[in-house]
Design a protein with these regions (language model features):
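Bacterial N-terminal signal peptides that target proteins for export
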Residues: 2-12
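C-terminal motif of bacterial Sec signal peptides marking the signal peptidase cleavage site
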Residues: 19-22
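Bacterial signal peptide processing site
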Residues: 24-27
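Alpha-helical transmembrane segments
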Residues: 14-17
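Tryptophan-paired
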Residues: 59-144, 215, 222-457, 463-464, ...
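A short, Gly/Thr-enriched small/hydrophobic beta-strand-prone motif that recurs across taxa
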Residues: 29-60, 217-231
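Short, intrinsically disordered, charge-balanced linker/junction segments flanking boundaries
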Residues: 42-51, 467-478
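Structured interaction patches on ligand/partner-binding surfaces of diverse proteins
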Residues: 98-101, 138-210, 436, 441, ...
């Protein structure tokens, strides 16, 4: 019986190469590039040697590589296609890789011998290999020698048909392990071909002979947010509370979510297979239409990593950071307000006064409202105490500030002026519900292009002295 040896290498180990050698010795060569070959395959053998290599090496454009646990392989399916060339080859058999179950490949190298399904023969045609790794919850499973997706047989399907299947989930995110992986498309092809040079009569010969390599990649990008922020320096807390020193709010904790991202993950990356546009160029060619999906939150407040399905290249994927403020050791859990009559409160690099209760804010306006603000509304000669005698301010269900000014002693004309002033104050006040502020950051996979790339890892560090990723400036009142 002839046997061949198969190695699956994660694509993050080979981003500098991004090519596939269908059959090779210890060093990778680029001589075989998939697609149609002239070799006639005699495949009476039914064993493979599968090697999975995990790497912690930093990837291209990734600020932090995924961990070994995130790259671990917990189960796998090996799919064999048969045909004259890759585009016309159809799926013949699928085999569960038994020894991967409950035996995750967390080490640098894992060698597994696996028997293929019987009847894997090709005389005058070619065989091609597709690996599906960490398939739990994706929709894939094996019944006999048949690959099922949503309980529907994929037998005799082409690689393009398999490629466009939208998987249910990229895998486990509660423990950050077991992310779905499959073939990483190379320049001009997706699946490596099994040539006769990779087939051996005995298992011993296969173990020391040529080997077949498949590059694989995760179906998700990894995003991590780290909080290194302390004070928010351009906010002064309750400047009229009698304190002689200027106080600034502190960052108590952050939570974060993703917005504007693609929720679909395909079995294999779709769109193009040119390696030069994937591994080395800053001008990726795939783009998706940005949609405003529901926020994709952290699994829990104790975790700091989320995963984005498929590519969002060219779209504005955002990290929305929610910051809970505190005053020294006291949490700011009530409605807070900032008055900005002359400028956009979010773009000025100057102090802004934040009032931590409606009462504090109304007291400030009663004592400090500039005369010109009153004059705009015909109230220049009216005492501030009368203007704000029955004032109320609140944040409505939509996060908007609503001011109300009334005085039963005022004439109808004066009351109309009060209403106009109240509308002005509503439109020039930022209201922060429960002492929370929001910061939005775009994710970029190059200096000029928004979006994320499948299989990459992104790390956003929030600090209080970095202009580009700063929490020293005031945040938005709502996401």
């Amino acid at each position: 019986m002839k046997r061949y040896r198969l190695h699956i290498w994660p694509v993050w180990l080979l981003l500098g190469m991004m090519f596939l050698a269908a059959c090779q010795s210890d060093a990778l060569s680029g001589e075989n590039s998939g697609g149609a070959q002239q070799t006639t395959v005699r495949s009476d053998s039914s064993y493979i040697n599968l090697r999975i290599v995990n790497s912690n090496a930093t990837m291209t454009r990734a600020t932090e590589a995924a961990t070994a646990a995130e790259n671990a392989v917990y189960d796998g399916i090996l799919c064999i296609f048969e045909g004259a060339d890759e585009s016309s080859a159809t799926l013949k058999t699928a085999t569960v890789i038994d020894q991967l179950i409950n035996n995750p490949g967390n080490s640098a190298s894992v060698e597994i011998t696996q028997r293929l399904a019987t009847g894997t023969h090709a005389y005058g045609t070619n065989l091609y290999v597709l690996a599906l790794l960490n398939t739990t919850s994706t929709g894939f499973k094996v019944s006999g020698n048949d690959l099922l997706f949503d309980d529907s047989s994929q037998k005799n399907k082409t690689i393009s048909q398999i490629q466009n299947l939208v998987i249910h989930s990229v895998g486990s995110t509660d423990k950050h392990i077991g992310l779905f992986m499959s073939n990483a498309p190379q320049s001009g092809y997706i699946m490596p071909e099994i040539s006769s040079d990779c087939l051996y009569d005995t298992e011993a010969l296969a173990a020391t002979g040529n080997r077949l390599t498949i590059n694989v990649e995760r179906a998700a990008a990894r995003v991590k947010v780290t909080n290194a922020a302390n004070q928010i320096r351009n906010i002064r807390l309750n400047p009229r509370n009698g304190d002689s020193e200027t106080r600034h709010p502190y960052v108590h904790k952050i939570t974060w979510s993703l917005n504007h991202y693609n929720t679909q993950s395909y079995a294999i990356r779709t769109g193009f297979t040119a390696a030069e546009n994937w591994a080395t160029s800053v001008n990726y060619l795939i783009s998706f239409t940005a949609k405003d999906f529901s926020l994709y939150p952290q699994k829990s407040l104790s975790q700091d990593v989320v995963y984005i399905g498929e590519n969002t290249t060219g779209t504005e994927t955002e990290v929305i950071v929610e910051v809970q403020l505190k005053d020294n050791s006291n949490m700011l859990m009530h409605e807070c307000f900032v008055f900005h009559p002359y400028q956009d409160v979010y773009s000025e690099n100057t102090y802004h006064d934040l009032f931590t209760s409606p009462e504090q804010y109304i007291a400030y306006l009663r004592d400090e409202l500039p005369p010109e603000n009153k004059g705009w509304f015909g109230l220049g000669g009216t005492d501030n105490a009368e203007i704000f005698k029955y004032a109320t301010v609140k944040i409505d269900a939509n996060g908007n500030v609503v001011f109300s000014l009334t005085n039963s002693d005022f004439t109808t004309v004066q009351q109309e002026s009060l209403n106009n002033l109240a509308n002005f104050l509503s439109n020039h006040t930022a209201g922060f519900r429960d002492g929370k502020m929001y910061y939005t950051y775009k994710i970029k996979h190059s200096d000029t292009q928004n979006g994320v790339v499948r299989n990459n890892a992104y790390n956003l560090t929030l600090v209080d002295n970095d202009v580009r990723q700063s929490m020293s400036a005031i945040g938005r009142p709502k996401p």
